Regions:
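Conserved short-loop catalytic and cofactor-binding motifs
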Residues: 28, 56, 104, 108
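NAD(P)+-binding Rossmann beta1-loop-alpha1 motif at the extreme N-terminus of oxidoreductases
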Residues: 1-51, 60-63, 90
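Short, hydrophobic beta-strand segments that form beta-sheet elements in well-ordered domains
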Residues: 29, 151-152
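Rossmann-like NAD(P)(H) cofactor-binding subdomain of soluble oxidoreductases
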Residues: 62-70, 74-146, 153
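A short helix-to-beta-strand connector/capping loop
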Residues: 51-60, 125-127
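Residue-level signal for pocket-adjacent positions within structured domains
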Residues: 35, 44-50, 54-56, 103, ...
Length: 153
């Protein structure tokens, strides 16, 4: 069982947190917005992003990045690509050397056209970064439907 922190409570981050939890991992889900973390903790559902999908009680939800990054084996970056540089800068001091970061955000940075994984590598040089991508949808993953993804470093 791995300790995994998913950084981002959008549909993709939440769906992956549920999948990882259902596969026996210890999962923490972090929101950059403490009020959203509090709401998700109370309702255990995000009706705007994943209506009808319950977040299992075993997933810890926090709005505190220090708590989320205290000791995970793997960190999943699931924030939108438009915010990835700011999130990476914010979290960089809390990421240890050799920490595994799995980027699941798609796209490029608007002003530089840099792929998201390159932004993370630039802002968090002490981490080992890989990318998970494929033809999948958060709604399907959250319901446990089959999908295909690959990881590349």
């Amino acid at each position: 069982m791995a300790k995994i922190s998913v950084m981002g409570t959008g549909s993709w981050g939440t769906a992956l947190a549920i999948l990882l939890h259902n596969n026996g991992h210890q999962v923490m889900l972090w929101s950059a917005h403490p009020e959203k973390a509090a709401s998700l903790n109370q309702t255990r559902e995000d009706p705007k992003k994943l209506p009808g999908i319950k977040i299992p009680d075993g997933i810890v939800i926090t709005g505190d990045e220090k708590t989320a990054l205290d000791s995970p084996d793997i960190v999943v970056f699931a924030s939108p690509s438009a915010y990835m540089r700011a999130i990476s800068k914010r979290l960089s001091p809390l990421i240890r050397r050799g920490q595994i970061i799995v980027n699941v955000a798609k796209g490029v940075e608007e002003n530089t056209l840099m792929p998201v994984c390159d932004i993370i590598k630039e802002e968090i040089p002490q981490a080992d970064v890989c990318v998970l991508s494929g033809p999948s949808h958060a709604e399907e993953v959250s319901r446990g439907l089959p999908t295909t993804c690959v990881v590349s470093a």
